[in-house]
Each structure stands twice: as C-alpha cells, then as structure tokens.
C-alpha cells in the first residue's frame, strides 16, 4: 500500500523536507499572507462546497482521487530527524488514538530543543485526539477506505473539530535560519488551518475567533518547539518566550501583523512602479487608485514626491496618452494634479469620439443605472482584447497573444482599481460560487492556462473583434480557413487551426451560435462582445448578466480577479477531436523553414542578403521557396537589436521646423571648445560659441576655465546683450551634456529666466551639428590666419574673433543673406577691416622723452568691440592696444616671420580701400588733444613674460663689461633704427592673453607698481644679472654720458647732483646689446634700491631666462668668497639639456630691436630704458586709467577680462580644490579583540598561536608584578573614576609573529587620574633621518635594539584599579595597578622619564636640547622610539658597551648588531633600509606595501598600463553637494581613512614626492565623492606601481670638511575660488633629501611673492633646529643655504627698505625673515624653476617634469 501511495505522488521526492501528503494543496489567488481567521472560515466553506460536488474514490484506489477533504481533520505529523526526513510517513487511524500521547511522556524519545526541557513543558491530556509520532519510522501505513467516513458536519466548536482522525496533512518544514522565520510562519499557520485549528489563529486585531483549549494549546506549543529550534528563532521571538514559554499565540499575532503590514506596502510600491494606462478605464478611477496608493505610502512613512510620482505615471502612459511624456518632461515643478488634468482632458475627448459610434443595444432602464457606454469597436482581422470593467481595471496587454512568446505568463498592467462604483459579483477564489453556478473544472487539457484565469469560463472582451478558443471540444462545423489573418495587441500573428461555430444553450432554453476561431496559442479563451452584440446579446455590467435587448437574462457574469467571465457550462460540446482540428488542411507554411530559424543559422544576416544568396544558389540544399518569408519583413531579432545597435540616423533638413517655430534670437545653440595646450597661463584656453537658429548670427567669448561660475557669467552677458540690442528673449538653448552645462547653478539660472535647456542625448554629437560645425569652421580659420600672418599661437583667440566678425558678414548659399542682414544689421564696412596680422605703426602719444621715436611697430588683429579703434599687437611692448592712431605698412610680404621692413612698397589697393575710413577719422580728430584720444592703452594692455625657452626671434644677449657702448653709440643707433627688421616673437611668456584687449569691470583702486624685478606680468623685462648683485669696481672707468642720455629718461626722483656714477652692463631680454646701469657709491646704490625694489604684489617668481644660480650675498650672510658652488654642489638637481643658441639674421646682429629703447610707460611696458621711472609718472598713469575706466563699456564676462593692473601671479592649477575645514582623521582599528582572536576564531592554527601569545603576555605581566596580587578589592569599595577598564588586543606583525597585549582603556580614563602636563615623547622623523644621513657620510655602525614590555618597567604614582584578566574568572573584583600598563594616559610619559634617567645616569648619555628622545655622548648617538632603540657610533664596541649596560636593567633584544661590512638590511620604524658602510644607504617600503595595499580592496591593475605620475594638471573637484545615504557615507569615509592613512604614512616616511597629492586628497576625506575616490584609487595605484622605489643616499665627498644643510622652498599662489596657496619645502643634508613638507598656507596670500615669503618663513625655524641637531651630533662646521626660484622674494629678504611694508599684511613676516636670514647666517640663493625640486610639493606637474625633478633622489 505504501508503494502505491508513493507511486501516486511522484512529485514528492524521497528524502525531502516535506512529509507525504494525500491531499492536493488548494490553489487560490488569495494573498498567502492574509491568514486571518475570518478569511479562513470563508476558505473552509468554499472547500466544503467544492468537495461536496466531487466524485468519491473507488475502493480499489490507494489514494482518493478527490484532492479536497470532506472536513477539517487533525494533522498527523512525522517526527523530525535533525534534517530532511528519511522516509515519507502518514498517520493511521490507530496511531491517532489517545494512547499515542504516551510518547510525549518520554522526552528522550523525541529530539527536543534545549528550551523544551524547561519546567514549563507539559504533555497533553489523555483525552486528546491529536495525532502523535509513530513508534517506528518503518511502520507500514494503512489507507482508510472511503466508506469509513468521508463527510462530516461543519461545526465551529472545539469538540467537533476533533471528531475524526482521517486527515493527513503536510507538516511545516524545519526552521533553519532566523531570516527564514517569516516564511516558516506562513507554512506553520497553513499547517494549523489544515489541522482544524484555524479558529485559534489570531485575527488582525490580535484576538482569535474562539477560545483555545488546553489540549490545543499543548499541541500548538509542542509542534512549535519541534519545528522551530530555539537557535534559529529571531531575537524578538526569543524575547517573548523568555517571558512565557507557552505564549505561542502572541508570536503568531505579531507575525501576522508584520506580514500584513509588509505586504500592503510592498504591493503598493510594486503597483505604483508598474502603472499602465491607455484610456480603457475611466480617468477618474485611475486617478483615485493612484492617489490612494500615494496617500497610503505617505501615511506609512514612505514619502513619494510630485516629481517621482509624475515620472512613474508618465512612464506607464500609452496610446494617445503617451505624448504627455514629451510635453510634460520639461516642467520641473509639475504636480500630480496637473498631470491628471491632462489625462482627464484626453479621456473626455476619447469618450466624445466613441459616443458618435453605435453602441450595444441595451435596456433603457439599464442605461439609466449604468452611465458608462461600451463601444463596439470592431477591427477586421485583428483581435485586440480590452474588456470593459466597472472597477476600471486595465485589461491584459497581451491576452490574445502567442503563449510561447511570453513564457506562458502574460504581463499584468497594474493600473487596476481595487473597488468600483458598482460592486459586481466577485470571486475571491475558484471555489466561490454565485447565482447557483456549479463550478466544474473542464476535463479538456487546455494549453498553457494563465495564473489569473478562471478555469471553465470564457473571458469577456470588448476590444476583440473575433472569438477565440483553445479547446476543440466546443467547436461545431469546423473547417480550415488559411486566409484568416489574426494578430494580437502587439501586432504579432496568431496561427489559426480552424474556424467553426460556438453554440450556447442559455438558462431560458434558447440556443445561439456565433463564429469561433480555434488556436491553442492564446492565454485565455476570449468571448467577443462584438459578436454577441451581432446576435442581440448584450453584457450588462450593472447587474452582471448577459441579456437580450428585451431584458431577458441569459447567463450570469462572474468577476474574477480583474476580469469578467461567463461559464462554459452554457456551451454545447461537439464530437470533433483535437487531432482532427489540428490536421485539417495544414497550412503550407508549416512545411516551410521559418525565417527566424534561417536567420539565426546564417549568422543573423539580413533577409535581403539571404534571399539574394538563395536566388543565386550560393547556398545549396534548399531553395528560396523552402523558406517562409511571411514574417521576414516585420521580424525583429532581439539578438540583432542588441549586437548591431547603432545610433539613430539624423535626417537632413529635419531641423527646419524649428526655424518656423521660433523668432530670431529665441533659439540658440552653444558649445565649448578647448582646452588649447602649450599656451601661456594667462591666455584663454577655451572659447564658448553661440549661434542663433534663425539668423545664424554667431558670438564667441574667451574662457580661461570651464567652471560653472565662468559659464554663468557668459550666459548672463549674452542674454542681456540680446535683450537690449535686439529686443528679444531667448526661449531655448541647445547644448550638450557636459558638466559645464548640466550643473545645478546654470540649471537654476535658466529656470529663473524662463529658458528651456535642450540637451543632446548621450553620445549623439551629430544632434549638436550647428555648434559643432561652427567650432570646426572657426578653428580652420584660426589655423589658417596664424599660418598666414606668422603671429604667435597665444593670439589664437584674436584669430577666432576676426573669423567670427567676417563669417557673420558673409552670405549663406541657402538663405542668400548674411547673418547680419537676418539680424537687421548693416553690412560690414570692409574699409574698416584690415587683413589679420597686417603690419602697422602705432603712434605713441605719451613717450618718455621728447627725443624718442613716436611710432611703434605692430600687427593688426581685429576691430575692437568697445570702440571705433582696432586691436593691435605690439611685440616690442608685449601687449595689445585698442587705438585708431596707426598707419598701415603696405608691403608684398605680411608674414610676421618673413616681413622685411627694408623692402616696404606702397600698396595702392590697400591704401585706396582704407582711404574713406582714414579721411573719416581725420575729419573727426582734434589735434593736440590727449583727452579725446580713444586709445585705451592701460585698459587693453597685455604684458608678456619670457617663455621658459628663449624665443628664437628675441634678442637677448649678455654684454660683458668690456663691450660697453661708448658715448657715440647712441647716434649710430638712431641712424640704424629705420633699417631694423622688426619681428614679433614666435614664443612668448606664459602670462600673455589676447583677452586683455577687453576692459574689466572690476578695477583695483591702487595701480600695480612695476619694477625691474617684475616677472613679466607687469610688462617689464627681466635682467640676466640681478641689480642687487655686488658691482665690480672695474667698471668705474666707463663713461656716464651714454647712461645719462640713454637710460635715465625719467630721473626726477633723484637729486640733480647725482652725477658721480658709473655704468654696469645689464642684459635684458629684448633689450639692447649694450646697456648700462649707473653705478654710484654704496650709499647711492642703497638709496636707489629703495626706489627700485620690487613691489610685494609682483607676480610670478620664476625667471626662466636665467640658466644659472644667482646667489644673493650680503656682508652678514656670505663670506667674501663666492659660496654658490659649495651650496649647489652635490644637490640632486635635474640635469637640463643645453639650449641651442638663437640664430639671428645679420641685420638683427647689427642693431637691437626697436623696443630696446623705445618703450613707453603709458602703454604699460617698462623695459631697461625706463627701469627707473619715477613715482610721479606712475601716479599720472593711475589718473589716466581711472578716466578711461569710466568711459569704457563692458559687454562680456568680467572674470575673463584682464584687470587694469598687470597680473600679479601666474594662474595656479590645483589637482583638487580644498574644502573649508577638515576634521581629524578617525584612527582605524587594526587589532583584534579577545573574542575575535580566540573565542570565535575558526582558524584553528591561528587561534593556537594567539592562545600562546596570550599566555606569554600573562606570564610577563606576573613577572613584572604589574598589579598587587596580595589583595583583591570589591567593586563597591573603590571610587568608580579610579577604575580603568582593561582588555586584551591581538595582532599579527609583519614578520608573522602573533602578539597579545593587555592594555587599559585610556580613552575613557578620568582626567583626575593622570597629570595632563606629562608628555610621552618619541624621536622625531627628521631626527632619525638626520642621524641616518650622518651615519652614511661618516661610516657609522647602526645597531637596532628592542626592549620587551617597556612600559611595565615604569612605576605608576596614581591610585588606579583595573578588572582582572578573563582567565582569572573574577569579574566582580578589582586589582590595583603598580606598573604603567599600556593604554594609560601617563604610561608613555612614565616610561620616557624612566629610560631617560637611566640613559643619562647609567650610560653617560645626554639628551640633545630641542630634540626629545635623541641622546648622545662622545661616541654614541641613540634615537629612542618607545621600546625601539637605534644606536649610531664610529666604534662598534661603544654600541656593545651601551647594550651591556641596558641588559642589566631591561630585557633587551638585539634585532641587528650591524657589524657586517656587506649590505645590511634593517626594518627601522617601518622603513626598510639597505646599508653598506662607506658606499650607500637605500630607504624604501617595498615589502610592507606589497603586503598592505592588496588588503585595502583597491581595484589594482597589475598588468595594465602603469601610471607615470600620481596626478596631472588641470583636474578639479566638483563642489556640488553630496547626496549619500548615511551608511554609504560612513562606509566611504572609512575607506578614505584607510587609503589616505596608508598613503600619508608612506609619504612622510620617504616618498616626499607624493606629499602634495596626499595633502590635497586628505582635505577631502569628509567629502568622499566618486571623483575623490577615483583620484585616491589612482594615487594608491601609483604607489603600488612604484612600491619598489627607494630614497637613495650615496656617501658624499665634500670638498671641505663641513656639513651643508639646505632647504629648497616653493609656493603656488591660489588665486581661484575654493583655493588657498600651497607651500612646500624640501630639506637636504649634504645633498641627501631628509624631509619634505607640503601644506596649505596658513595665511591668506594676495600674490605669488607673498606665498613665497610665507613658504620661506615656514622653513627657516626647522632649518635652524636641524642645524643645531647636526652640530650636536657632528662637530664639523655647517653651511646653511636657502634656495628659491623667486627673485622678487630674494630682493625683499635682503632689502633695507621698511616703509613699503608698513601697510602690508605680511610685512611683519617679511621683516622677521630678514632678521632670521641675517642673524643665522643663511645663504639665500636663486635656483632655476626647471631645477627646483620643491615644485613637486606645491602643484601637480606634467609627467615629463615630474620625472625630471625626482629621478635624481628617488628611483
């Protein structure tokens, strides 16, 4: 019998966790979580009615065929076997008797969980009728016969619930995890329901339907314990059981409450996310549904804002409502109510069109009750299903579709409304019957029933034009009809097997027939309301019946789920079999190869290619006629769509509709071009262009960066320009999706001004063709203009500006008009236009001297925006001016690098072309009036520095004293000027900017005072030899006549009797070959220095025209002999390749350029000839500037306009922008607790090692008598603030040693228990590096020691108590400390005082003043770091003597004695050192990094391209506000702490080249954006790639027996928002890099010079301290040097002028720096920027520069 039972249930596998079940589970659409008692009663009633209609099982059957039980029965439960059941078992009638309870009397027979053995356990009573476990698993089970009782009366009493033992139900599975408890409770509740205990299950309010009996409570308690072991119960369940072991009812009540709450929220979210609406249901019902869901979610704490709700609604719109997605997506503040207004409007429009069509014939009385109309929309040859539902639920979108295509699970649209205005007949499950129906499941095997289908019923569909059925047993007069073409709602073909009649026999004995199509490939049997209407049958959804026009009711309509159904019992069966239907006239296409199959076989080629290949017999075996091509045209291969995806095609001329929709200047296109590399820093690197859609008018604006505020200013400017000049308002701006356009600032600006941003789609540049093509055209013109004119590249934007002016004036071939004509502007007057780069002579209206020439050669660029003048580039003055005072030089050659002024010819054409304009200017000029001169030289000046590489077209030749120009030279020079070939430099200094030609709105009230030391931004020439250098007395014999007549053009600032001076030759870039500077007595020189000293505001501190170090010497700082060679010698500076000499023509060799002595101060250029311009002339320039500022017109971005004063510094490019405040980094725990290392450690081997370390530490504590073992104190007796918590920490050292440490919780130590004044000192890293450097130079022996348990040697003075270690088992006792336990606040200080006293008294050492933990005597130097000691000495025996003395008191271990003459490897405080005495020392961390970096979980790329530098210039951090979840934010901050912590450790140890990047990234630890994390990953990747790099020290071989200590300083001026200046210093001892520092400036600097002064002032204190340390450790003389690449800073340091600093913020710092330099005998020297290795500490550098500056000292 048992085998028969098992054979009847093949779905129950052997060994499954479920017991065998003789009854099928009831399939229902009821929510499985809805298990309240009220619904259980309905469920039982439905089951009883359904079973009463089933046939009984024959006696010979082992298992009844009826899957439903006659009445509720107690369940028979098999015993658990600590896992899956080994065999299926069922309870018999005899095993369910009361005697079976005896097993519960012996708990040993059942595998109880621990809490079952509690005193609360009790067995059931003797009268209990509940089942029990069988006595043996293998007992045969008998099956009761059907006659033994298969029907019972339905009763709700407890007694009647237990009157039968015939039910066999599936027990719940064993609970195996706390996370599975919610699902397990569902099965357990179902188990109770099947066991006739549904009445005791708590309802929603937490109360059961009836009172539970004692036996039921016992059964409930015991089964819960058996199937829910205590170790797998959730915490909240355990809490309930800890109060009352039997309170299972409370657990069930809370579980049901949780399930119902979670289910409702989940269902609402899913429904809202899958909304679908196409107008098939009333709009008001759809709105009610959506608003109800949103309200419920908001009430439950899930807030859905308007934006999200509108997006979800619009995503589900289809049909005529779909266009709302595109018309509404631009409205950011749209509400749900506004959206529904549009939906209602469309719905009402649809209803109006439907009412015009014929409706179903209905009873007039019904039309009064039912206001809805059901339109008969018949579609020939198309079956679409859209049933009318009073609950406004939307029909399935693919009900009449091929089931195989949709995996037998048609998608359900979730815009159904749960309730309707009229309540129809509703079936909650298949067993609910109404109107006397007898629901009998059809015996026909339907194909692919859908989950939500009501078996045995037809689905009413108002949208279907034909009736379709899957079963052939109801089709009469079947015949094939291959001409029928039926498609589903998705336009897919549905194969039809046959056509026939569907005959109905209704309740009034009337018979009706309609046409029906047979197909097995649909999800539902569809009954078309259209065909019923053709036979005078109408569906009345008010009464939910099918009726005739006279009101005769034919059949009821049943609502099940979201749809309406009619029972198949009204259908008359036929005698036609299914095979007959399927084989009648099979379509010819079924014998052909389907096209999708051929398409896939032939590598997914297109249909045209396949068909052509078959025609030409390139593919054999079958012909073209063998393939079914019917679906080839419409077939869409999903794999092809994915694999062959391309961008959409842009249709030519598709944008024309916008031209008709918008007026001029309402629709703009914009785009940004750039950056342009290898340009001066002050020149614009970008430009932004705008194009009007209608007129094609263009605008261009220069940009220095792409920051959002710069873009915003340009947008503000052009919008105001269009509004004021053209009286138009911009409505739409089209742009790409660059961050400069999509940022929040610009978005808010556009929204505020009512402008709609129109963005291109992702990776679709062709959609932005107007702007892209304009940029390409302008760049083509730019390159051509620069090539033709020969002008330098930094004037590239002037070429863009010129091209824009011309292009706006040229006619378009399409429109036959120019952009200016479309805009209503006059055509371009070509008489006002000059060729780009046309040579001209500009009039100097304010020369320095009356005898100086009045003309300056220049090159015309483009007409001015702000005046009637022309923008002209003056190469001699290195600036551009806006003027009308120019004369055209007509010549055959106009290229700048080819123009020959000796071959000038008069060009009649050009002169005739510009004659009218020149006459117009002449007629309007007023002679001898400077006030009316429209030239604005100061406004538009652009001063140029020297390029790092010497310009090949600029004469810069130093003149020796013997080549001084005699007095007669001046006359000769004057004669040669007319023959000089004037050429503009091809390469210019980094601070040039053609954007300077436009005025600035923001002007400084104080003019920039230029001076001889200006770095180029002030328009001055640099000097090859500083004026402050000592002057040779050998030049006193030179004549001063030439000096007076040539150089001192403005000498009114000096007394008239200053005549006794000589000339010192000075070379200046672009100056004369022979220039002299007057030399006077020492007093006179000092007096002039006061006037000539550079302004503190002077900008860039570099002078790249110099290629050698220039020391600045004073009588106090330098010895008489030249010390520059001794200071620079042996420094690891890069080797620069020699620069090739500049090739000049013969004419250039003969005479200097014009600008050598024809500069004019009013134009802003001050060369050597006017280096001594007086203060009065500068004041006059200021007045002129202020006058011109008032009349200037500003028409574009103020941030892109150059200031009146020359730029004070070069533009600094940071790697990232700094934040305003940075909090301290939270330390990261790297140790393990006791429970982690021992208690719960699953690694047995590691656990054993930690146990050994634990016992070792305990023994050491006892050995050192750490606490008082004579007495244990009660916790209540001691003051709580003197009680210190203690713990064991475990860690694994890099060498593999497992270590345990017993520590005190000093972090919660009370302040009264220690002295805050005591400090624990360790050796400073600079002191260690200094000691190592001296050891390398002096062949010292290096010995490394370790003192075990160092802190325990120090006694503790305070009265402190701790809890004993865990192994003592005295948790309620305290012990008093006697030693300084690790972790106490005072332990470090106590140990320092202890070891310091011992070293001084017993070892004869003394501590170096100012350097804690550095001890020395005449032979040995000791560096102390807690318990680690490093000994340095010339004699190894001296080290051994110290070791012997230490061992007398402390447990001292020798880590490395250092006695070998070969290479010795050390691991000193994290540094891996390789040392060979007398040769070299290498410092690195390769092994440590190889171990630590992979543990950081950073995505490393070991085989990919290695990074060549830690960062590149030009990267900025996006300053937008982060939007992160709290947990995600904390996780990322924690990750940043780990990464930056490791990088900082490596950087400050020896990788000083990374300090800038580490410092700037550390400022963003609390701003962990994706960009910051990516940059951090790149830094870690670079450290990983270069982990084998080492700091290399070779033994120095000094020429003199002295130590040389040098600091190289640098600073980068932060002149951008969110930036502060960055300072950096590198310290070198005898040519070895021993330390570095990179940090933000603590003071706000207003210029580069201020930043340089601040950097130097920060380096001097440490330099002096290191000098003292070196002198203490090594008694040799010491030379101290300070190197900087800022000549202006050097001038300030040694200047005696103090007046100029009184009003300066940093004046005090500068004057203090002077005193320190003078008092500490510092040699201040100049170093070239190219050789300044401190550059890596202040700014990100290009790869080539970074390598050049670091490869000498770290590799």
Swiss-Prot record:
Residues annotated to bind Mg(2+) 1: 671, 736
UniProt-annotated site: Cleavage, residues: 401-402, 582-583, 1217-1218
Segments of this protein annotated with the region Disordered: 1-93, 126-173, 352-421, 956-1170
PTM text: Initially, virus-like particles (VLPs) are composed of the structural unprocessed proteins Gag and Gag-Pol, and also contain the host initiator methionine tRNA (tRNA(i)-Met) which serves as a primer for minus-strand DNA synthesis, and a dimer of genomic Ty RNA. Processing of the polyproteins occurs within the particle and proceeds by an ordered pathway, called maturation. First, the protease (PR) is released by autocatalytic cleavage of the Gag-Pol polyprotein yielding capsid protein p45 and a Pol-p154 precursor protein.
Keywords, ordered alphabetically: Aspartyl protease, ATP-binding, Cytoplasm, DNA integration, DNA recombination, DNA-binding, DNA-directed DNA polymerase, Endonuclease, Hydrolase, Magnesium, Metal-binding, Multifunctional enzyme, Nuclease, Nucleotide-binding, Nucleotidyltransferase, Nucleus, Protease, RNA-binding, RNA-directed DNA polymerase, Transferase, Transposable element, Transposition, Viral release from host cell, Virion maturation, Zinc, Zinc-finger
GO cellular component entries: cytoplasm; nucleus
CDD domains: RNase_HI_RT_Ty1
Assigned EC number: 3.4.23.-, 2.7.7.49, 2.7.7.7, 3.1.26.4
Limits of the Integrase catalytic domain: 660-835
Signal sequence segment: none
Region (RNA-binding): 299-401
Compartment annotation: Cytoplasm; Nucleus
Annotated motif Bipartite nuclear localization signal, positions: 1178-1212
Domain of life: Eukaryota
Any GO BP annotation: transposition
Other remarks in the entry: Retrotransposons are mobile genetic entities that are able to replicate via an RNA intermediate and a reverse transcription step. In contrast to retroviruses, retrotransposons are non-infectious, lack an envelope and remain intracellular. Ty1 retrotransposons belong to the copia elements (pseudoviridae).
Protein name as annotated: Transposon Ty1-LR1 Gag-Pol polyprotein
Gene source species: Saccharomyces cerevisiae (strain ATCC 204508 / S288c)
């Amino acid at each position: 019998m048992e085998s028969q039972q098992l054979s009847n249930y093949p779905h129950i596998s052997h060994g499954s966790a479920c017991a065998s079940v003789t009854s099928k589970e009831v399939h229902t659409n009821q929510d499985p979580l809805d298990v309240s008692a009220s619904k259980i009663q309905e469920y039982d009633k439905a089951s009883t009615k359904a079973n009463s209609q089933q046939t009984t099982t024959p006696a010979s059957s082992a298992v009844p065929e009826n899957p439903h039980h006659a009445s509720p029965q107690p369940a028979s439960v098999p015993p658990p076997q600590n896992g899956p059941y080994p065999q299926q078992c069922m309870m018999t009638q005899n095993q369910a008797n009361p005697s079976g309870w005896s097993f519960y009397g012996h708990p040993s027979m059942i595998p109880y969980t621990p809490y079952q053995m509690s005193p609360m356990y009790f067995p059931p009573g003797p009268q209990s009728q509940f089942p029990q476990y069988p006595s043996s698993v293998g007992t045969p089970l008998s099956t009761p016969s059907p006659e033994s009782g298969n029907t019972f009366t339905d009763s709700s009493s407890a007694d009647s619930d237990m009157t039968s033992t015939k039910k066999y139900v599936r027990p719940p599975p064993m609970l195996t995890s706390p996370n599975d408890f919610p699902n397990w409770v569902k099965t357990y509740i179902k188990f109770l329901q099947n066991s006739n205990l549904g009445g005791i299950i708590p309802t929603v309010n937490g109360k059961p339907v009836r009172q539970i009996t004692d036996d039921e409570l016992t059964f409930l308690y015991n089964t819960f314990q058996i199937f829910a072991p205590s170790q797998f119960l959730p915490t909240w369940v355990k809490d309930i059981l800890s109060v009352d072991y039997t309170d299972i009812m409370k657990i069930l009540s809370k579980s049901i409450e949780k399930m119902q709450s979670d289910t409702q929220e989940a269902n609402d979210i899913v429904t809202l996310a899958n909304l679908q609406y196409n107008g098939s249901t009333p709009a008001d019902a759809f709105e009610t549904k959506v608003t109800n869901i949103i309200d419920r979610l908001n009430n439950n704490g899930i807030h859905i804002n308007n934006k999200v709700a509108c997006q979800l609604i619009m995503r589900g719109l289809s049909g005529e409502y779909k266009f709302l997605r595109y018309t509404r997506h631009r409205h950011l503040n749209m509400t749900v109510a506004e959206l529904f207004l549009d939906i209602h409007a469309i719905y009402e429009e649809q209803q109006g069109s439907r009412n015009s069509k014929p409706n179903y014939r209905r009873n007039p009385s019904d039309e009064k009750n039912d206001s809805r109309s059901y339109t008969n929309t018949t579609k020939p040859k198309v079956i679409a299903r859209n049933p009318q539902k009073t609950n406004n639920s939307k029909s399935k979108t693919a009900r009449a579709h091929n089931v195989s295509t949709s995996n037998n699970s048609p998608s359900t649209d979730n815009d159904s409304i749960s309730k309707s205005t009229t309540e129809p007949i509703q079936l909650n499950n298949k067993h609910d019957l109404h109107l006397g129906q007898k629901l009998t499941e059809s015996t026909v095997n339907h194909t692919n029933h859908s989950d939500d289908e009501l078996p045995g019923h037809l689905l009413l569909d108002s949208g279907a034009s034909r009736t379709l059925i899957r079963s052939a047993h109801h089709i009469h007069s079947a015949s094939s009809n291959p001409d029928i073409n039926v498609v589903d709602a998705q336009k897919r073909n549905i194969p039809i097997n046959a056509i026939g009649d569907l005959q109905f026999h209704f309740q009034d004995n009337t018979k009706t027939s309609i046409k029906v199509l047979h197909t097995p490939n649909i999800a539902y049997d569809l009954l078309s309301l259209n065909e019923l209407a053709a036979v005078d049958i109408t569906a009345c959804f008010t009464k939910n019946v099918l009726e005739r026009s006279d009101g005769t009711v034919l059949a009821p309509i049943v609502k099940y789920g979201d749809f309406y159904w009619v029972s198949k019992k009204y259908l008359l069966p036929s005698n036609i079999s299914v095979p007959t239907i399927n084989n009648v006239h099979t379509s010819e296409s079924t014998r052909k190869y389907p096209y999708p199959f051929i398409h896939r076989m032939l590598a997914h080629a297109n249909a045209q290619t396949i068909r052509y290949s078959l025609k030409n017999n390139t593919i054999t075996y079958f012909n073209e006629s063998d393939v079914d091509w019917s679906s080839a045209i419409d077939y869409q291969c999903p794999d092809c769509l994915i694999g062959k995806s391309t961008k959409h095609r842009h249709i030519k001329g598709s944008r024309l509709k916008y031209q008709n929709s918008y007026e001029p200047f309402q629709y703009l296109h914009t785009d940004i071009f750039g950056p342009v590399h290898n340009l001066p820093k002050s020149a614009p690197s970008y430009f932004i262009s705008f194009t009007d859609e209608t007129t094609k008018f263009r605008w261009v604006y220069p940009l220095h960066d792409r920051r959002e505020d710069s873009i915003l200013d340009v947008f503000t400017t052009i919008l105001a320009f269009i509004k004021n000049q053209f009286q138009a308002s911009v409505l739409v701006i089209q742009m790409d999706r660059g961050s400069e356009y999509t940022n929040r600032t610009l978005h808010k600006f556009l929204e505020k001004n009512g402008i709609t941003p129109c963005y291109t789609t992702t990776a679709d540049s062709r959609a932005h063709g107007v702007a892209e093509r304009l940029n390409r055209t302008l760049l083509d013109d730019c390159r051509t203009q620069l090539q033709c004119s020969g002008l330098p590249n930094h004037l590239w934007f002037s070429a863009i500006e010129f091209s824009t002016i011309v292009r706006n004036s040229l006619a378009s071939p399409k429109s036959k008009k120019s952009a200016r004509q479309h805009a209503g502007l006059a055509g371009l007057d070509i008489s006002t236009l000059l060729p780009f780069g046309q040579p001209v002579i500009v009039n100097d209206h304010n020369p320095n001297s009356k005898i100086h020439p009045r003309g300056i050669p220049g090159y015309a660029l483009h007409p001015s925006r702000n005046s009637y003048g022309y923008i002209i580039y003056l190469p001699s003055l290195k600036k551009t001016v806006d003027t009308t005072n120019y004369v055209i030089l007509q010549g055959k050659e106009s290229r700048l690098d080819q123009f020959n002024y000796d071959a000038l010819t008069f060009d009649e054409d050009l002169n005739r072309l510009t004659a009218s304009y020149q006459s117009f200017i002449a007629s309007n000029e007023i002679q001898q009036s400077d006030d009316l001169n429209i030239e604005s030289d100061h406004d538009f000046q652009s001063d140029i520095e020297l390029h790092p590489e010497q310009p090949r077209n600029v004469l810069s030749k130093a003149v020796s004293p013997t080549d001084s120009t005699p007095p007669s030279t001046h006359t000769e020079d004057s004669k040669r000027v007319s023959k000089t070939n004037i050429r503009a430099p091809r390469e210019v200094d980094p601070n040039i900017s053609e954007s300077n030609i436009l005025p600035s709105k923001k002007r400084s009230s104080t003019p920039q005072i230029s001076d001889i030391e200006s770095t180029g931004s002030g328009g001055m020439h640099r000097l090859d030899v500083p004026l402050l250098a000592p002057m040779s007395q050998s030049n006193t014999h030179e004549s001063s006549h030439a000096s007076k007549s040539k150089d001192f053009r403005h000498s009114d600032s000096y007394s008239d009797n200053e005549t006794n001076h000589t000339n010192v030759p000075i070379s200046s870039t672009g100056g004369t070959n022979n220039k002299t500077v007057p030399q006077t007595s020492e007093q006179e020189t000092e007096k002039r220095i006061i006037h000539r000293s550079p302004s503190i505001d002077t900008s860039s501190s570099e002078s790249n025209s110099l290629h050698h170090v220039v020391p600045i010497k004073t009588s106090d700082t330098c010895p008489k002999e030249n010390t520059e060679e001794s200071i620079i010698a042996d420094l690891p500076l890069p080797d620069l390749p020699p620069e090739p000499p500049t090739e000049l023509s013969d004419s250039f060799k003969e005479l200097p350029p014009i600008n050598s002595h024809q500069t004019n101060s009013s134009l802003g250029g001050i060369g050597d000839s006017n280096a001594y311009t007086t203060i009065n002339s500068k004041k006059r320039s200021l007045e002129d500037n202020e006058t011109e500022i008032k009349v200037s017109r500003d028409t574009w971005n103020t941030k892109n306009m150059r200031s009146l004063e020359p730029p004070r510094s070069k533009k600094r490019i940071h790697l990232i922008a700094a934040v305003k405040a940075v909090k301290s980094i939270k330390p990261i725990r790297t140790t393990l607790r006791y429970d982690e290392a021992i208690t719960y450690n699953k690694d047995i081997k590691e656990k054993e090692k930690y146990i050994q370390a634990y016992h070792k530490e305990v023994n050491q504590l006892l050995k050192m008598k750490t606490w008082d073992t004579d007495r244990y104190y009660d916790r209540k007796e001691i003051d709580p603030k003197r009680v210190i918590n203690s713990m064991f920490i475990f860690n694994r050292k890099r060498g593999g040693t497992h270590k345990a440490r017993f520590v005190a919780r000093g972090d919660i130590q009370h302040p009264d228990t220690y002295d805050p004044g005591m400090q624990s000192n360790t050796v400073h890293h600079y002191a260690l590096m200094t000691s190592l450097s001296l050891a390398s130079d002096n062949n010292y022996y290096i010995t490394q020691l370790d003192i075990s348990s160092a802190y325990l040697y120090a006694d503790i003075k305070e009265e402190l108590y701790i809890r004993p270690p865990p192994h003592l088992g005295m948790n309620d006792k305290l012990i008093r400390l006697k030693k300084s336990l690790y972790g106490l606040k005072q332990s470090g200080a106590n140990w320092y005082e202890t070891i310091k006293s011992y070293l001084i008294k017993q070892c004869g050492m003394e501590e170096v003043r100012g350097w804690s933990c550095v001890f020395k005597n005449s032979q040995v130097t000791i560096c102390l770091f807690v318990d680690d000691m490093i000994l340095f000495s010339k004699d190894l025996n001296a080290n051994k003597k110290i070791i012997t003395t230490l061992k007398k008191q402390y447990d001292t271990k020798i880590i490395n004695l250092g006695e070998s003459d070969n290479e010795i490897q050390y691991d000193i405080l994290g540094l891996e050192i390789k040392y060979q005495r007398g040769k070299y020392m290498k410092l690195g961390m390769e092994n440590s990094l190889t171990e630590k970096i992979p543990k950081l979980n950073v995505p490393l790329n070991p085989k990919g391209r290695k990074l060549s530098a830690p960062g590149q210039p030009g990267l900025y951090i996006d300053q937008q506000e982060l939007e992160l979840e709290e947990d995600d934010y904390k996780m990322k901050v924690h990750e940043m702490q780990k990464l930056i912590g490791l990088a900082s450790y490596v950087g400050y140890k020896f990788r000083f080249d990374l300090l800038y990047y580490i410092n700037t990234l550390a400022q963003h630890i609390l701003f962990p954006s994706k960009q910051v994390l990516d940059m951090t990953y790149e830094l870690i990747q670079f450290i990983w790639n270069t982990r084998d790099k080492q700091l290399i020290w070779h033994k120095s071989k000094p020429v003199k027996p002295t130590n040389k200590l040098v600091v190289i300083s640098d600073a980068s001026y932060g002149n951008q928002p969110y930036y502060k200046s960055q300072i950096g210093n590198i310290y070198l001892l005898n040519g070895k890099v021993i330390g570095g520092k990179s940090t933000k400036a603590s003071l706000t600097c207003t210029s580069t010079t201020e930043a340089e002064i601040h950097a130097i002032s920060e380096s001097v204190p440490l330099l002096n301290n290191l000098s003292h340390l070196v002198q203490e450790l090594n008694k040799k003389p010491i030379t101290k040097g300070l190197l900087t690449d800022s000549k202006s800073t050097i001038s300030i340091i040694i200047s005696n002028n103090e007046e100029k600093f009184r009003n300066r913020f940093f004046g005090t710092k500068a004057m203090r720096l002077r005193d320190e330099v003078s008092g500490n005998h510092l040699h201040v020297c100049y170093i070239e920027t190219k050789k300044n290795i401190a550059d890596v500490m202040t700014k990100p550098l290009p790869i080539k520069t970074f390598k050049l500056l670091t490869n000498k000292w770290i590799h």
